[in-house]
Swiss-Prot record:
N6,N6,N6-trimethyllysine PTM sites in chain numbering: 116
Source domain of life: Eukaryota
Family: Belongs to the calmodulin family.
Full protein name: Calmodulin
One function term, GO molecular function aspect: calcium ion binding
Keyword DNA-binding attached: no
Pfam families attached to this UniProt entry: EF-hand_7
Additional free-text comment from the UniProt record: This protein has four functional calcium-binding sites.
Species of origin: Heterocapsa triquetra
Amino acid sequence: MADQLTEEQIAEFKEAFSLFDKDGDGTITTKELGTVMRSLGQNPTEAELQDMINEVDSDGNGTIDFPEFLSLMARKMKDTDTEEELIEAFKVFDRDGNGFISAAELRHVMTNLGEKLTDEEVDEMIREADVDGDGQINYEEFVKMMMAK
């Protein structure tokens, strides 16, 4: 399944993997998965984290390595984002709940994920998604951007 991914997608997933793999040892543990989930406002139990890892841990060693992560992402891309998942993702970014993602909100979430972005990079991300030019991202623009990925 992972062989249907483009090189660009694989590079993006490698970057995502390294956000999870906090100690850089090439595997994602339940602890590391929990850290990232909590930084996104989720609060999974230890059992839920273990279940998530077990779902993709094909060699049964209790952690996720990059090939396992790739096959998970390839699977996830096939069941493309349901509307519910998109709404949840939008809410993670729209911290004040006003229906818009501002540059500050985008920077905050990206920083929580370990991505230190310059103001220029944040502004560029907003500009790319901001169809109506109001300087922030509304839900429709967010959906368009997510579907274009």
